[in-house]
């Protein structure tokens, strides 16, 4: 079996008898295979020549293939052709040849070019509508319906409608809907176009181009390439800048540049083409001249011949529509180089007076104004401003430029200073302007420089008091008393007012809390260096009968030698040891002793600060009847603080109603900054600050070395309910002190809230504790008697002590030198100065009316701060 299979497989005679099967002809070779005759079963058909598919026969072969693949109509048409193909080879070839040779006949069956021309189509379009339609009738035009009825593409209808819209014969309603106006507005728009063309000197441009064409005998291509720069150069020499290419009127139809789509629209070009007919003296315009003028207006420097011919073709379309409107007709102009096609104006004659009325429709006075305004709008939209170069810009770049300009406008219009609040400065509720806070450091520095240039003077500054108080007599100082100088009234809601011009560098900030409607103030005081003053014997703080509370704070600087202060007690009833507080009954006696002369002089509000450590006294020739307590302020500045944080420590205590002059509720405030004066919300006799006006403040200032200044509020500042007091922020204090040169840049001031304070009666004064220099001086803190504290509590007067930011040294026996800093951060070791003690140096100090605290030297160093 295997041998038989092998024999069958290798039998050559059987192979010779077998016939090779024919390949199935593909669809592309079906015609050739059918045409070829059958020469016998053994012959192999000739293979048709294969054509490489990489390179198409024509440039549009691939495009046709893609279109046939996408368009179902073309694909179906090809399929139908394939179905109707006759498989008979010779007959199919004859049919194909007949179809090829009958191409002209097929074109003859289609509409001719003349029938498809825009002019004929425009005639058909205009025949559908009357020349002067009735405005009461609906005259809307749907372009889709018109294109379907006329059996043309819609774009052909758009070409007609754009030219008609340029003459205001139609107006656009929607994307493909227009309203037919006919020739009602034709004369009016022609008058406007003529006047605008005369203003832009179109006639002179036409004459200039004709003159150059006569002079230059070149062909159209050469003349076009050479005449443009020649004309531009000669127009400047002839003194006609309006005809220069850069300044020739262009198009400005709400577009970014003249090369945009709207500027090249058929509507704008039609208006300019009609304008050329209206302004030319022989109203004959060739398309070449019109194309040159319109090309120059486009400000295109690199136009080639193809663009110029494109412009001429567009003008031909416009001319066909205008010819259908019987406005122009085609003529030929004979020139040296031959005949040239041109068009002659056959439309209505337009009078040179543009204000002539339209003969068709009656016009009123309002119509004349509307006509003039329409003329201006047309001139503005049709022609650009002179002397404004235009550049090509893509719409995406327009949006980018607009966004950049808007950002630049926002940056330039942004306020460079803090916002100002516009309120009446005269009212009590006016808010200070924040913009001056930014200039605070510069103003203070300038004032300090001015003051440093002047010689040091001891000036007594007296500010005008309230209406019911008299002026306070000046105090003589050991260094030749100077005449009084009235400081400027602190009427402005914000500002820097020097309390005393003195070129001293250190400063003590004093916080003045205001009412909730206002802001806090900080007084930066500059203590003097050398001289101190003590009031003469017999002087005691005078109390104004009309006030509801008083505050007397007197602080003395202690001596390093620890002198015995018993010898100083008979000299002055106000010189006290540190830490002694006046009991209630004895202080009332002191008030009664001075009440009679105080009533004679009128109610006076003052505060006394003295320095008993230096043992300097007032001059003996001071008048005795002037028993007026004065506040001795060094030079300083009143600085309002608009942004403050509320103090964490505030205490309130209702006093007994046994005294009719006392207000029911008062609160005492302690400052977290060492060296800052705490202020009571009750009225203090030392200083009177009405709301947003510091004029009633009386400051009798002498160059004393002080550590704290009593500050008070007026009745306007007192409220029936307690409110938190604001504390200046650290940034404001550090910024101001550093720019004033008061502290070094490395030193930072902390203004965080300090420990709470003990409740105090409104009749008890606010007590300020000032740090003392522990390195050079040892202070003696006199201790209060417990019996005095109990006596004050039984009388309804509780003892008050402010939260000091540093420990107060005790008596020299047990005192330990503690490193203290000028500005201490809150939370350090504290000791209430008003704590009841048992050690007193003498019995005379128990009858004193003020609390004296040892003073330290105002020396600030970075080591102390850290």
UniProtKB/Swiss-Prot annotation:
GO terms (BP aspect): cell cycle comprising mitosis without cytokinesis; chorionic trophoblast cell differentiation; hepatocyte differentiation; negative regulation of cytokinesis; negative regulation of transcription by RNA polymerase II; placenta development; positive regulation of DNA endoreduplication; regulation of transcription by RNA polymerase II
Record localization: Nucleus
Gene Ontology CC, one term: RNA polymerase II transcription regulator complex
Residues annotated to bind DNA: 113-182, 261-347
Function: Atypical E2F transcription factor that participates in various processes such as angiogenesis and polyploidization of specialized cells. Mainly acts as a transcription repressor that binds DNA independently of DP proteins and specifically recognizes the E2 recognition site 5'-TTTC[CG]CGC-3'. Directly represses transcription of classical E2F transcription factors such as E2F1: component of a feedback loop in S phase by repressing the expression of E2F1, thereby preventing p53/TP53-dependent apoptosis.
Protein name: Transcription factor E2F8
The family this protein is said to belong to: Belongs to the E2F/DP family.
Disulfide bridge positions per record: none
Main subcellular localisation: nucleus
